[in-house]
Amino acid sequence: IIVRSRTLAGFDAPYVPGWDCHGLPIEHQIEKLHGKHIAGDQVRELCRAFAGEQVERQKKDFIRLGVLGEWDNPYLTMAFKTEADEIRAVGKILEKGYLYQGLKPVNWCLDCGSALAEAEVEYEDKTSPAIDVAFPVHENHAEKLAKAFGLTHLRGPAFAVIWTTTPWTLPANEAVSVHPEFDYDLIETPKGALILAHELAEACLKRYGIEQSEGAVVGSCKGAALDQILLRHPFQARDVAIICGTHVTSEAGTGQVHTAPAHGVDDYVVGKRYGLPVNNPVGDDGKFLGNTPALSVGELAGKTVWDANPLVLQELEAKGLLLKGEKIRHSYPHCWRHKTPIIFRAT
């Protein structure tokens, strides 16, 4: 109405209609019509034809409604000229040094094989494994840990304890995060000396089946005092450090957060501050890559993240580092198209 009235009033009011012809909704329609296992070039051909049909249908409806526009010369994002112009524009951005390649964790749908925007994520209840894992303190840092807790020495092995509902992300662990301002206790127990947030310690010991009389607090300190103390990775031959991050909460868990920069935004942000690598062992199909280190109980390579969960639990149990394992029902992000659980994955 506005375009028509301004044109009739003598103004130059050109309207060039256009259509965004790309996106997962079109691919999803083709998948529903033709199945998931067709070749990529055929998918693109079918998507182009489907988009063209929709353009013509909508164009007829707009013309019938009396919309005044250049209907013989619309812009289409799938037009080869438009795509070529986009590449030229990106080339200019690249030449000016405004573009760089990096990794960042995003919502990832295993069925779409693609990243999802926040608006494409729905939350539904899901049952997940919830585990408490002990990270052994590196023997070369035992003295440093003792000093942090005001002790002259440790009487035995000590462990930083994390709680997670995504065991499959442990192969990508690069650190354990503590809150710099939280109070942490070193508690001697039959399972070793455990580092736990003071506010959560009682609930944790109860969860591990340790009687209150069996747990003796031998020292306390702020999380900041634990910064850069080295730990042994639970099942890989490498070390990870305790680092400080304000994303750590005392609402649940142990007050220490398993940190995998490839699989979480908070992990990525704190990891970037500490210069941690963003090592992503999971492919876009949700399966572990071929170079993923094997566990003593079996191979992770080629397994989906969901199939990896029980293997990781078996490995931790075999090494005596699984303090507690249970199932919980919680709200979890799902793909709005496939209604299937998604993951965070660096890409």
Spans of model-derived segments:
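A short, sequence-level motif marking secondary-structure junctions
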Residues: G150-T152, T165-W168, A197-L205, T246-V248, ...
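N-terminal, positively charged nucleic-acid-binding surface of large information/translation enzymes
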Residues: I1-K191, A260-V265, V270-R273, P277-T292, ...
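Catalytic alpha/beta core of large soluble enzyme barrels
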Residues: I1, D12, A172-G283, E317
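A glycine-biased structural micro-motif
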Residues: G223-Q228, L295-N309
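Mg2+-dependent endonuclease catalytic cores in nucleic-acid-processing enzymes, primarily RNase H-like
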Residues: G290, E299, L313-Q314
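Extended hydrophobic/Leu-rich segments
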Residues: L145-A146, A197, L230, P310
